């Protein structure tokens, strides 16, 4: 049975997180399978400005969409027309969309691969759809995952419509809202079992985002958590720099895995049942893919609000994290030592704030970011932003300057004079 420790979340966020972990979630032993002759597998045609959502999937011989070929987050049923498809005299399995995002690859991209483990001898190929017209080399940990599953040599990746003699569409074995099948976990267990043996083991690991290429532009203060966990005996691991085999062994052999919210905790799908997980929350938003992962892996998870939110932002940031009072309370309760004093100094927190404000302006200028999907969660968002406002009050209310041009503004000189007179 999974266990969740909500004590280190802000109260309203803790209540929302608890609600997600306790939502009805069905276990299905065997997902459904659709099978049809002369069906067409389509590439994904992007339909939104962000380039995230598209339409595609499979259509039957009569041109009707096969409902279970859609992908919850990013591939809607096909709309409109497409080019005259090529015909191939082959029986294939539709594997879904080969999404280029590691977290979504794990929770959406591979969810149909359970059918490969059924060992159907009549299948010629397994087919992934790419974006329409996309030329992409599948490499790195994406390719290694498929190699470890032993499916790589049977795969085809298509970027244009192709009609096959026969197409099998396995249902996704995992959906964040609704259900999962044990066959989904079989995929990850197979990959883990085929991974190269561990060359060394460590007791506790912290999976960090601090060396990601985009980190310096949108993520501020994350190094403080690297230092905090390292000083408390954790081995800091940078997943993007570690081969998948090695990463799997790190996770499976760890006593405790700590990491930052987002895609990184979803790597626990490679882990053992019932492992201990610590998630440092990087923003106000709850990553609603993680609760079902915690449930099906029976993880013993502690959430920590290590973030200092300023404005509403999506999961792409910018963010401030660090050794705030919530992390300090967690450290005290668990007899842990703090990070280097530099990481919780006034100067360091100010530098994080300045970086955040520059990043926010670069991304959004003077617009206020808000999407409809955030509205139902606004109570715990307001709670978070009130926390951030209090943390950085003197900068947000205009009492102290933080950008060079502020020193040219009369307002800030007035504030300085008021402080001098008050001290006198």
Segments and roles (model prediction):
Residues 1-413, 420:
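The feature primarily captures lumenal catalytic ectodomains
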